[in-house]
């Protein structure tokens, strides 16, 4: 009697499991949420066979450990000027377990930089999102409104108590109107702010895949990333050129001011040198503000010694030295002159 044929599940090799793991772990810029949803359906189908699931889990852990040991090329937009640099380093331990990441290590609020209407095959709109994991590390991802909607549906299933405000869909109207797209961009920005405001939601797998927190995209992963990379370089170059022109104008202005000050100093030195070489020259007291020049002749400060001697003898007053009188009068005249110059 022939025995009936019963199929026996066989374990899948390490190469196949690693290939599946690599395909599911790396999500592209477009449709990353849809890709992860497809992989979740495949996992539900695999859960029907108990022994096969255990074998696959063990193989995936082995392949994940070998994959995390390899270097990872990351793109960094550093500083306020968004300059670009690259670093090759192995994945960190917390990337293997996203649920173990500290709340302090969560990314800052993603910023939607703008939108663009694509018309290559089918017309659609993509939103350019700037994600900052740390002040030194940031990257750009591109998402459609459909990606936001799918993420919102997933979060409703995972967190029934939370209700995130997502801009509604628009029916029977033009979805590519500029005013409508700007309003939708503001609504999506508020949606992202609510995502990172809650600890559990910000660290869940769906959000991490949506923002590519575990595997940031490189500048050459797709055409969109390459174009964003070039646009960032162009914008940085433009700002640097403007700053350079402003600095050059400031330098020219300072050079002109320095030349004027140097001419003024040279004129003062020439005048001082002239006065020191001519001891009998007149004394000048000038004011630069009003342009007034006061001149005192040496003859004004001289006193006729003979006249003073005769007057003192006629009045029978005590005799005093005419030189002392001249010095006193000269001191009085100079003091009065200095006081008047300060008043003017």
UniProtKB/Swiss-Prot annotation:
The alphabetized UniProt keywords are: Coiled coil, Cytoplasm, Endosome, Lipid-binding, Lysosome, Membrane, Phosphoprotein, Protein transport, Transport
Tell where it localizes.
Early endosome membrane; Late endosome membrane; Cytoplasm; Lysosome
Residues where Phosphoserine occurs?
A: 222
Biased composition, Polar residues: where in the chain?
A: 14-26, 52-68
How is this protein situated with respect to the membrane? Peripheral membrane protein
Q: What is its main location?
A: membrane
Q: Name one GO cellular component term.
A: early endosome membrane
On subunit structure and binding partners, the annotation says: Homooligomer. Interacts with EGFR.
**Which family is this sequence assigned to?**
Belongs to the sorting nexin family.
Domain comment quoted from the record: The PX domain mediates interaction with membranes enriched in phosphatidylinositol 3-phosphate.
Name-wise, this protein is Sorting nexin-16
Q: Which organism is it from?
A: Mus musculus (Mouse)
Q: Which gene encodes it?
A: Snx16
């Amino acid at each position: 009697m022939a025995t009936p044929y019963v199929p026996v599940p066989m374990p899948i090799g390490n190469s196949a499991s690693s290939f599946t793991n690599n395909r599911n772990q790396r999500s592209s810029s477009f449709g990353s949420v849809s890709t992860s949803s497809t992989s979740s359906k495949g996992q539900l189908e695999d859960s029907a066979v108990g022994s096969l699931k255990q074998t696959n889990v063990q193989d995936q852990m082995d392949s994940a450990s070998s994959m995390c040991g390899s270097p990872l090329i990351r793109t960094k937009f550093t500083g306020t000027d968004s300059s670009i640099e690259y670093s090759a380093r192995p994945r960190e331990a917390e990337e293997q377990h996203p649920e173990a990441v500290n709340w302090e290590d969560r990314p800052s609020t993603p910023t939607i930089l703008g939108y663009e209407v694509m018309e290559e095959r089918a017309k659609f709109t993509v939103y350019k999102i700037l994600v900052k994991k740390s002040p030194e590390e940031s990257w750009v991802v591109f998402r459609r409104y459909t990606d936001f909607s799918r993420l919102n549906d997933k979060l409703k299933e995972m967190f029934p108590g939370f209700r995130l405000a997502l801009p509604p869909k628009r029916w029977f109207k033009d979805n590519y109107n500029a005013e409508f797209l700007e309003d939708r961009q503001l609504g999506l920005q508020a949606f992202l702010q609510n995502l990172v405001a809650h600890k559990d939601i910000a660290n869940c797998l769906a959000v991490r895949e949506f923002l590519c927190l575990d595997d940031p995209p490189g500048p050459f992963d797709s055409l969109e990333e390459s174009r964003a990379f070039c646009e960032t370089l162009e914008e940085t170059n433009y700002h640097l050129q403007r700053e350079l022109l402003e600095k050059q104008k400031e330098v020219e202005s300072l050079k002109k001011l320095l030349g004027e000050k140097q001419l003024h100093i040279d004129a003062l030195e020439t005048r001082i040198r002239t006065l020191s070489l001519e001891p009998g020259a007149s004394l000048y007291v000038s004011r630069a503000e009003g342009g007034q020049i006061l001149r005192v002749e040496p003859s004004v400060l001289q006193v006729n010694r003979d006249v003073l001697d005769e007057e003192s003898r006629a009045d029978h007053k005590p005799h005093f030295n005419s030189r002392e009188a001249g010095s006193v009068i000269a001191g009085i005249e100079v003091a009065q002159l200095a006081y008047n110059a300060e008043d003017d």
